[in-house]
């Protein structure tokens, strides 16, 4: 449904009618993920005189609570592509890596797994991070974001079956699974501090297809209403394609407004300042496309792409109940599996006394309700690699139980004895973004090239560790089929990073420590910023949205200080060639 349809149905909407837009703003924020929502909220709320006019543009549609797809047909119908530009879920397939992300007001916060976690301090000591951006510097901004997003652990985390299953491997290596801080509401039943109605989490497990309960603390529940209540204008279904630097100062945005799946119109808007926060795929694409139209940029733009070391695997049909079947709004019946809890609740960190590049984080996952039946059928066919002998009869019975069409949520089925894992590690962040030029699209389409990405040794080590998890649960091991079964070593990531990395100067980064975009001569473009995951110059080994939030909180604060008279420092144009050689 489009914004117009939702308004006709009487739903409260954050977005404004497109016809009410102005022609010129002080600030235009492109994208409504953690970067765009936070920047707009902080700037709109700041005590500034005169108060700047702020416009936030989002290419996707608005998804009020209760409108998220929860059946496999509606989930598949909400895939974003050329014929469905307002779809919620986007799966981008490149030669070496595929990317899973969301599209809508609130960005990927609508469909992520909620985990708010701070990386190791050593991550920021990598040579590709600016020396002024350390974990200690960012800690106050982490705290600021965590407070607004209301991050905290599940109150019964250690009682959940999937967390106890994580512990079966953890104790073998002398550690334990620990509850993660997640941005999920477990207490508020009514209006939250930002005036938005919420309900407590029901443990339904549908976080990554969209929370229809209203318990997930997406940006739709906090930063976006903060921005709107403070005067920012929000427009959805509005895709920015490229930006133009105006001769007299300021910027012109070129894009298309999508009225529905079949109707769109081109538009331009002008602004003194533009904040690109369209994500690690789209912000670099906008800048690269703008370069084609004459914008001078750093030679580093389009480099440093990382999948955050993401990797997936399964321990299928083991000896213990795991309760990983999502229910959505369905009510569990007597004798059925217990609801799983949020998509991710716990983790095991492999960080003790090992080099940074060998550290990994393993997290539990659940199956959202729309995928339960398909997962049962698919994994029964794959079966996987048996890790222990003597349990074949019990496994056959559990697989048979899963084929019961009248009782899809049987607690004694194979899928409810399965663990689904997300792992994050340190990849080499050497992906590059380029443009192909098909005949039907004059500016081309962006591609990501990263030869040998999936053949990095860390992914083989992760695969072996997940096999050990499966053995600890007396399960069959199923690796990521794209990586293992077809032997392509193709990666899949839900956490794209880089492409417009932070750097000390224009030869080491595409933007400076405050997200100001470098020109090709070493200066910064006045009034052009990036605030999203594309700034992150390395893998983090943990879920990245809290780091993106902290970087944006810092960038927004510094921008407000500049508006109050505390000028930005001059960019460093004195580049050490020896430093460049050392980093090559």
Task: Name each model feature, range by range.
Residues 26-56:
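N-terminal Rossmann-like FAD-binding beta1-loop-alpha1 element of flavoenzymes
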Residues 133-239, 492:
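Conserved redox-cofactor binding core of oxidoreductases
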Residues 45-54, 58-72, 213, 229, ...:
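Glycine-rich loop(s) and the adjacent beta-strand/alpha-helix scaffold that form part
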Residues 1-27, 45-51, 561, 565-584:
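Extreme N-terminal leader/targeting segments of oxidoreductases
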Residues 93, 131, 298-443, 496, ...:
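FAD cofactor-binding and catalytic pocket of flavoenzymes
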Residues 104, 113, 533-545:
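Glycine-rich phosphate/pyrophosphate-binding beta-alpha loops
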Residues 204-207, 245, 417-425, 429, ...:
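A glycine-rich dinucleotide-binding beta-alpha-beta segment and adjacent secondary-structure elements
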Residues 75-156, 424:
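Redox-cofactor-proximal catalytic regions of oxidoreductases
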């Amino acid at each position: 449904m489009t914004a117009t349809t939702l308004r006709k149905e009487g739903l409260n909407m954050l977005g404004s009618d497109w016809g009410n837009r102005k022609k010129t703003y002080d600030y235009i924020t492109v994208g409504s993920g953690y970067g765009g929502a936070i920047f707009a909220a902080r700037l709109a709320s700041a005590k500034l005189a005169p108060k700047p006019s702020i416009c936030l543009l989002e290419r996707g549609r608005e998804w009020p609570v209760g409108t998220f797809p929860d059946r496999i047909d509606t989930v598949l119908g909400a895939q974003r592509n050329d014929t469905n530009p307002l779809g919620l879920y986007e799966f981008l397939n490149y030669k070496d890596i595929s990317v899973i992300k969301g599209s809508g007001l609130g960005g990927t916060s609508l469909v992520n797994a909620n985990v708010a976690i701070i990386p190791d301090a050593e991550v920021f000591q990598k040579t590709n991070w600016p020396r002024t951006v350390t974990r200690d510097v960012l800690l106050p901004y982490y705290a600021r974001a965590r407070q607004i997003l209301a991050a905290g652990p599940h109150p019964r985390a250690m009682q959940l079956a999937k967390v106890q299953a994580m512990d079966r491997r953890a104790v073998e290596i002398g550690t334990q699974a620990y509850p993660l801080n997640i941005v999920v509401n477990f207490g508020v039943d009514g209006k939250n501090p930002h005036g938005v109605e919420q309900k407590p989490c029901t443990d339904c497990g549908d976080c990554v297809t969209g929370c229809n309960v209203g318990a997930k603390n997406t940006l739709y529940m906090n930063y976006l209403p903060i921005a709107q209540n403070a005067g920012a204008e929000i427009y959805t279904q509005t895709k920015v394609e490229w930006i133009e630097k105006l001769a007299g100062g300021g910027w012109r945005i070129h894009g298309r407004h999508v009225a529905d799946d079949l109707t769109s119109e081109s538009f331009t808007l002008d602004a003194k300042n533009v904040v690109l926060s369209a994500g690690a795929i789209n912000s670099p694409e906008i800048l690269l496309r703008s370069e084609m139209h004459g914008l001078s940029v750093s030679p580093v733009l389009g480099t440093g792409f990382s999948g955050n070391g993401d990797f997936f695997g399964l321990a299928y049909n083991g000896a213990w109940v795991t309760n990983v079947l999502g229910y959505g709004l369905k009510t569990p019946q007597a004798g059925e599996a217990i609801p799983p809890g949020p998509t991710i609740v716990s983790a095991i960190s492999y960080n003790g006394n090992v080099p940074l590049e060998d550290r990994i984080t393993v997290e539990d996952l659940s199956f959202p309700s729309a995928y339960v039946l398909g997962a049962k059928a698919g994994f029964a066919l794959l079966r996987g690699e048996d890790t222990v002998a003597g349990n074949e009869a019990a496994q056959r019975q559990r697989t048979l139980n899963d084929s019961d069409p009248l009782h899809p949520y049987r607690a004694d089925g194979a899928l409810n004895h399965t663990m689904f894992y997300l792992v994050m590690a340190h990849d080499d962040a050497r992906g590059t973004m380029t443009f192909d030029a098909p005949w039907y699209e004059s500016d081309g389409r962006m591609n990501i090239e990263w030869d040998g990405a999936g053949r990095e040794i860390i992914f083989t080590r992760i695969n072996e560790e997940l096999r050990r998890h499966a053995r600890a649960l007396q399960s069959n091991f199923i690796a990521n089929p794209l990586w293992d079964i077809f032997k392509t070593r193709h990666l899949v990531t839900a956490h794209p990073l880089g492409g417009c990395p932070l750097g000390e100067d224009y030869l080491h980064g595409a933007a400076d420590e405050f997200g100001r975009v470098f020109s090709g001569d070493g200066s910064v473009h006045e009034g052009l910023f990036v605030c999203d995951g594309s700034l992150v110059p390395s893998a983090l080994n943990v879920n990245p949205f809290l780091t993106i939030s902290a970087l944006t909180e810092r960038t927004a604060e510094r921008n407000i200080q500049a508006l109050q008279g505390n000028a930005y420092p001059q960019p460093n144009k004195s580049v050490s060639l020896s430093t460049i050689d050392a980093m090559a």
